[in-house]
């Protein structure tokens, strides 16, 4: 049996005003994900003449689908300083002051044109009809939200799905 493990490294790119998620998979015999690098010029995080950026693992989760582990990363510059696109570092500094807050993930699925899926006029109806709804008139893209539920099977349970 092989001792090779796969780690899917996940990070936010440098696109503005809204960054996108990026990922790449590393196969290794190491028991925990090592630091890794990537070409920041392809993700709006570095100039082409000096494009190395570092991926520093923050948290690792068991992956219920493809690779062995999902590795949430923060980005640092090649000199190991916090990268400007790394908003996690600022949030971590703020949280060190013992603030309490929670996150609830609520989302709408949209088409490429930005309009919500499932509403003929492009605008959602009043919330009462589809809040916690079922059926084709009230729910679109259920397979995506069900895939989201796979988070329950990672090493840390999801909360408030």
Description of each model-found segment:
Residues 1-152:
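ATP/Mg2+-dependent ligation/transfer catalytic cores
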Residues 153-161:
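Single conserved hydrophobic/aromatic residue that forms the stacking wall/gate
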């Amino acid at each position: 049996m092989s001792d090779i493990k796969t780690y899917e490294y996940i990070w936010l790119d440098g696109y503005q005003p809204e960054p996108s998620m990026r990922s790449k998979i590393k196969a290794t015999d190491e028991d925990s994900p090592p630091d890794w690098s990537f070409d920041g010029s392809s993700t709006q995080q570095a100039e082409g003449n000096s494009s190395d950026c570092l991926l520093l693992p923050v948290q690792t989760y068991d992956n219920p689908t493809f690779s062995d582990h999902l590795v949430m990363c923060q980005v640092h510059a090649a000199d190991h300083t916090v990268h400007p696109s790394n908003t996690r570092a600022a949030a971590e500094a703020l949280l060190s002051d013992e603030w309490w807050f929670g996150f609830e993930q609520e989302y709408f699925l949209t088409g490429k044109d930005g309009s919500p899926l499932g509403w003929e006029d492009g605008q959602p109806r009043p919330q009462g009809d589809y809040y916690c709804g079922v059926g084709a008139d009230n729910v679109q893209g259920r397979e995506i939200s069900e895939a989201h539920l796979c988070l329950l099977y990672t090493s840390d349970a999801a909360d408030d799905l």
